[in-house]
């Protein structure tokens, strides 16, 4: 487990590490061991390359999008113990709640018309860079609607790099691509050095 003192100071480790292109994740089969990874190739979603189908546009009309109103609930949705290969533990949630309190970690939440949390995503923002950590849905298309909203917010605020870490088949269907680590690090430097609006 990430010890409580470490969880409270996790931002002092995570933010500098993310600035080098590393990403954190608990190591499978080794409870409590946190690893830092720098995948090569690296998955990103170009902000002008998100694929939004007509059916997704229609689906989005059924939802309301909010930002940073229920960060913990989004993390718990992403960390649902019923999900296969779950890696988001209560200690991990505590660490990210601290980073949220400090203004580093953010969530995009999607609510249905009844006011229930239908899905969302969370990640870490540093300047013009956003590291998408995880997303979930309880209703069809809700996580995709959150991703569309994130890309819109990033474009509107002048952000430059949406890091997905790995390029899964699901993310590729939404426009994620793989780039070599050297290209990723070049883009990361530009995003960290660039001026993005809050």
Language-model features, listed with the residues they occupy:
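N-acyltransferase acceptor-side catalytic subdomain
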Residues: 1-198
